[in-house]
Amino acid sequence: MPRFAANLSMLFTEQDFLARFEAAAKAGFSGVEYLFPYDFSSAEIKAKLDANGLTQVLFNLPAGDWAKGERGIACLPDRVEEFRAGVDLAIAYAQVLGNTQVNCLAGIRPQGVDDATVEKTFVANLKYAADKLQAAGIKLVMEAINTRDIPGFYLNNTAQALSIREQVGSANLFLQYDIYHMQIMEGDLARTMTAHLGEINHIQLADNPGRNEPGTGEINYRFLFEHLDRIGYQGWVGCEYKPLTTTEAGLGWLKTHNAI
């Protein structure tokens, strides 16, 4: 059975952020992930991790103004210096928190910029980040996201992600494969994860439709969990879903699959 990490941006939101670490540990999780750590000091978060015996699995590079609808800046030609500063900030946090991977959100395709320039910017930024992170012993992952939830999101399918990875040409760049997003965009989940096991360093989950916990929608998670074991996936699976009711009430799927 895969190792599951609680996504604290979406789970245990009944409590303040720093209280969610203890809640996750009490629920049986051994790892955590979330969108961003930057509203808190790395020392504050590290103390919560240590107090609750949790592994910091992943967080994202700074992604612009989230409250204003930005969803990454890596493909934006006029934000390169901001992106590079964000890489340095992420490294500083990861070196304290102990995670060995960070995720890059491409962002929403900018209006009035030609496709070639957008792609060139994204590739160059990924190359810069992959090299800087590699020097710090940290892997870079990038996530394809469906364009129904985030219209215009630049990186939105596996084939595109693999093409971008080839252009970057770094052995330190991997895929974060989000089962929910890719079910919407392309399906064929098991075959894709099998074919690209070597390029996938992190997986996230939610059911579809609704982005709720496994067992509430169309995805056969029992099969997929067993499939990940069969193909030898060694990474974490981040639980990035919206509980249908409360977090605690929606954790039955973990017990059903003997995951906690």
Regions found by a protein language model. Name each.
Residues M1-G28, Y38, L89-A92, G98-T100, ...:
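Histidine-acidic metal/acid-base catalytic patches
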Residues F29, L54, I138, Y233:
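Short phosphate-binding/catalytic loops that engage adenosine nucleotides
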Residues I73-F174:
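Active-site acidic/histidine proton-transfer and metal-coordination neighborhood
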Residues Q15, S30, Y34-K120, P243:
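Structural motif corresponding to the early beta-alpha repeats
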